[in-house]
Structure formats: structure tokens, C-alpha cells
């Protein structure tokens, strides 16, 4: 998994060097978050990054990680689809729109919070 996110990995290490801070990255398969408690996998993390991606694989696991970050005041950084998922998590769990969804997902919903631009 590390090689798939090499550019993010390097960017975080460069930032930590500039901030004179130690960095330890823990890679977590989002599908594991669908099968296990987010607390079990994320406890002890000082920040959570959900990168971009495609498809529905691990989708709800990523939402669980984002919810865990919000509820436990852990800094969160969502990139592309990761940011869209943060919007969905907030819509579902704070605004009570339980079926909030993005059109990028194959799941049907009456409440698409994020749509696809016509030019895409």
C-alpha cells in the first residue's frame, strides 16, 4: 500500500522535516475499518489522512475513520474523495441525513450531497 501513496508519503515527511517534527505513518486498509472498530485501529493516531481514490471499495471504512477523527478531535486531512467523504460523514452523523451520498458512488440515494459536474 505504501508505494501507491508514495507522493503523499514523501510530502508528509518533507513537511515534518521542515516543522522539525518526528513522523510515523501507519497505513490502514479502509476495508479493515469496515470489519473492525475504528478505535482499535486508530487509537493513538495524532492525525488521520484520507486520500483520493475511486470506487466503493473501503468506502464506509473511510467514513468510519473520518467520524472517529471528528468525534475524538483528531486533526483530519481529506484529499479529493477524502474531503467529499468528510462532507458525507457530517451530513449523515451531524445533520441526520442518513442516506447522504455522492454520485461518484454506485449506491442509490435520495440525498446526493455531492454531484458530478456536467463537464466530467
Residue ranges and their predicted role:
Residues 1-120:
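N-terminal beta1-alpha1 cap of cysteine-dependent amidohydrolase-like domains
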Amino acid at each position: 500500500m505504501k508505494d501507491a501513496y508514495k507522493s503523499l508519503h514523501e510530502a508528509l515527511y518533507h513537511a515534518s522535516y521542515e516543522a522539525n517534527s518526528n513522523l510515523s505513518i501507519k497505513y490502514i486498509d479502509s476495508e479493515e475499518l469496515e470489519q473492525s472498530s475504528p478505535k482499535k485501529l486508530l487509537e493513538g493516531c495524532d492525525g488521520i489522512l484520507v486520500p483520493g481514490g475511486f470506487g466503493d471499495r473501503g468506502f464506509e471504512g473511510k467514513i468510519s475513520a473520518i467520524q472517529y477523527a471528528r468525534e475524538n478531535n483528531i486533526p483530519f486531512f481529506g484529499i479529493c474523495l477524502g474531503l467529499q467523504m468528510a462532507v458525507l460523514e457530517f451530513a449523515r452523523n451531524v445533520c441526520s441525513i442518513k442516506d447522504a451520498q455522492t454520485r461518484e458512488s454506485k449506491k442509490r440515494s435520495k440525498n446526493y450531497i455531492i454531484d458530478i459536474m456536467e463537464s466530467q
